[in-house]
């Protein structure tokens, strides 16, 4: 497992490689929720999401002679770009194995950062594919089930508490659970009274199913439009941290995530992806837990949505 010291070490390790993203208040959202609402704008991070924090912490933790032939990863979304970018910055080649249905903007951006992209029919096959690269001397970077990756993601939590010491609630979306595990570890370590709320969209609910079953559950398919939340399962490690730190996980329909995306664009002037906008949809469902004295942070984890998808989702 990992702890606050690991997250603080990660921050020093990745300093200068990533941005400290803004935490801004929203008068409009505060009025609508009946509580003080703040937006952690991680969509302004390099590569458009938080993922680069974990990717850098992983690769920079490895001595140069232990980095192998390069980096290899499985991703149908933001982790792909993060690993490709991190590899390019430290002078390593990268191979990203992606499902064939990955949106074109993700594939193009990943190639734009210098990675070789290998397309496979299903994400389950992608994980089998990288085993071949590992045996051939490549270093794999798991999207969530790695303490070094989680510690890197947890630096978001450090920034939240430093910028808003009296934070009462943090709302974070969940894919495989590594991001919320890191953020929750940082937030709860620095401010034990703060509450961390998880969010998933219907059709990408691996953590909700795991919490109900008491163990990780393999999803047959990802049917949500929030593709970047589309982990086929969580891990034993991320499940344990969710059980330890989270108040609950709220399940949000795609329609509510898209309605929230539109509102954030129109009123907060930020273009998120559904995996981020779902935090606002969840906050509205959780409003009975908040009061006028609540200081609620919505973590807008990414903004990598194509114009094509945006138009399609709105029609």
Q: Which residues make up each language-model segment?
A:
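PLP-dependent amino-acid enzyme catalytic core
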Residues: 1-315
